[in-house]
Each structure stands twice: as C-alpha cells, then as structure tokens.
Amino acid sequence: MPIHRGQEAWSLLLNGLYSIEFSAGPDKPRGSGVVVLCDGILLGGDSSLFYKGTYSQRDGKFEATVRTSRHSHHTPSLFGLDEATLSFTGTIIRGDARGFGASSQLDIKLEVHLRFRTQIA
C-alpha cells in the first residue's frame, strides 16, 4: 500500500518501485515489467528488455522518454525490435500513473499504467 503524506502526494510519482503494464490496443499483445523511479531517472525491465530513461512531473502530469534494449533472446519483444526509444505522457492519479506513448521507430501507440508498489529512499 502506498505511503502518502498529504493531498499533494496523491498527484506525485514518489521515488519507488512500480509495476508497469502496457498494451498497443484491446486486441493487441500486452506486456508487463517493473520500473524504479528515482529523482527523474527511470530504470527497469521485463523478461526480454531492460528500460532506461528519464521522467518529469508537474501539476499531476508526467512525461517520460525511455530507451529499451534487449537482454534476452528467449522471449520475443512486444515491440518487435531489439532497441527502441519511446516517449510517454500521462496523468498521475492517487500515486499511480496512466498515459500513452509512441515511438518514431514503431507504428504503434501504447497505453501504459504504472502502479506504485513500494517507496525507496
């Protein structure tokens, strides 16, 4: 359960561990993984890719730029590429985040949902 102090925290992404779910549409493949957000840096991954990027937040909104790179060839990538750069924008709701993303390398739009799991220092 998230630790929130005051109403302002409900519209912030706290430094912490988040689960991430993403999809390219209702009848399209879905993916999931984990990310750590800490002071504007985003790090994470799933069974085939690792993620590295930056994020910013203001007035209950967030923006992120993420580069994905393959670490395992045992599981296919949802994106179909070994490396891609994605940009996301969205809204922070009760400490979690929902938004949309795209990449000039991919002809897809992604829906993304970050769920806060635990705080880090």
Model-derived features: positions:
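Edge beta-strand at a domain terminus
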Residues: P2-G6, S32, T54-D59, D96-A121
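Tryptophan-anchored aromatic micro-motifs
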Residues: P2-K28, G99-G101
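Short, solvent-exposed coil/turn segments at beta-strand boundaries
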Residues: L13-L17, V34-L42, R58-K61, G90-D96, ...
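Short beta-strand segments that buttress and anchor functional surface loops
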Residues: I20-F22, L42-G45, V66-R67, G99-S103
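Short, surface-exposed beta-strand/loop "edge" segments at domain boundaries and coil↔beta transitions
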Residues: P26-R30, F50-K52, H71-S77, Q105-E111
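Residues that act as N-cap/strand-start positions at coil-to-secondary-structure junctions
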Residues: P29, V36-C38, S47-L49, D82-L86, ...
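Short, charge- and proline-biased low-complexity linear segments
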Residues: P29-L42, A64-P76
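Contiguous, well-ordered beta-strand patches that form the walls/edges
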Residues: S47-D96
